């Protein structure tokens, strides 16, 4: 997978594990000063919430052993 030069919280950003940012929910995350973003897995299309600070390293909770997503 090629490098994505967007900021990790920008809609459309895809991390090295194939997780794409769909949108900012505007809801607070569970990490200090973070918001919850909706991500979609490129492999299985599962959608889940994640802290903005975690997007760069997230794995899909449905097919790649990632942590459970945040509610949104």
Regions found by a protein language model. Give the residues of each.
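Short, intrinsically disordered terminal segments enriched in charged and Pro/Gly residues
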Residues: 1-37
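Cys/His-rich microdomains that often coordinate metals
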Residues: 48, 67
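Generic structural motif
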Residues: 30, 42-44, 53
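Short cysteine-rich clusters marking metal-coordination/redox-active sites
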Residues: 41-44, 60-63
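Short linker/helix segments within small regulatory modules
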Residues: 49-59
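Short, charged, intrinsically disordered terminal tails
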Residues: 70-71
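A broadly tuned preference for mixed-charge, low-complexity surface segments
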Residues: 20, 63-64
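Intrinsic low-complexity, intrinsically disordered segments enriched in polar/basic residues
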Residues: 2, 44-47
């Amino acid at each position: 997978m090629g490098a994505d030069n967007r900021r990790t919280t920008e809609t459309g950003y895809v991390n090295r594990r194939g997780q794409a940012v769909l949108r900012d929910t505007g809801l607070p995350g569970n990490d200090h000063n973070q918001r919850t973003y909706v991500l979609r897995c490129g492999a299985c299309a599962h959608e889940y919430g994640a802290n903005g600070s975690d997007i760069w390293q997230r794995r899909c909770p449905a097919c790649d052993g990632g942590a459970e997503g945040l509610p949104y």
